[in-house]
Amino acid sequence: MNLERLYKVLLGPVISEKSAVVADKGNQVVFKVVKTATKPEIKAAVEKLFNVNVRDVRVLNVKGKTKRTRFGLGQRSDWKKAYVRLEQGQEIDFAIAE
């Protein structure tokens, strides 16, 4: 795969209560990814950027919320979330990640 594409696939980690519970319980990390990203691209990007072995990837599309603005109703953008399960004994520490 194109190296430039792999660097653009991951937009950042998702920091929430649910992602913290999943990280502790199932050795998983949650990322916000580009809407056009595929599972093999996400797996390759995580393995390349963080030097870990990925067991599997699950993705879901998050629908944007409808919010009120001073101009009426507005819509937040839809986005894609990826749950990445790492091999046993592997972990990603975002504080020291390159």
Swiss-Prot record:
A single Gene Ontology CC annotation of this entry is:
ribosome
Its function?
One of the early assembly proteins it binds 23S rRNA. One of the proteins that surrounds the polypeptide exit tunnel on the outside of the ribosome. Forms the main docking site for trigger factor binding to the ribosome.
Protein's UniProt name:
Large ribosomal subunit protein uL23
* Matching InterPro entries: Nucleotide-bd_a/b_plait_sf (IPR012677), Ribosomal_uL23-like (IPR013025), Ribosomal_uL23/eL15/eS24_sf (IPR012678)
* UniProt-recorded Gene Ontology molecular function terms: rRNA binding; structural constituent of ribosome
Disulphide bonds in the chain = none
Superkingdom of source: Bacteria
Record-stated family:
Belongs to the universal ribosomal protein uL23 family.
Coiled coil segments of this chain: none
* Pfam hit, one: Ribosomal_L23
Q: How does it assemble?
A: Part of the 50S ribosomal subunit. Contacts protein L29, and trigger factor when it is bound to the ribosome.
* Keywords of this entry: Ribonucleoprotein, Ribosomal protein, RNA-binding, rRNA-binding
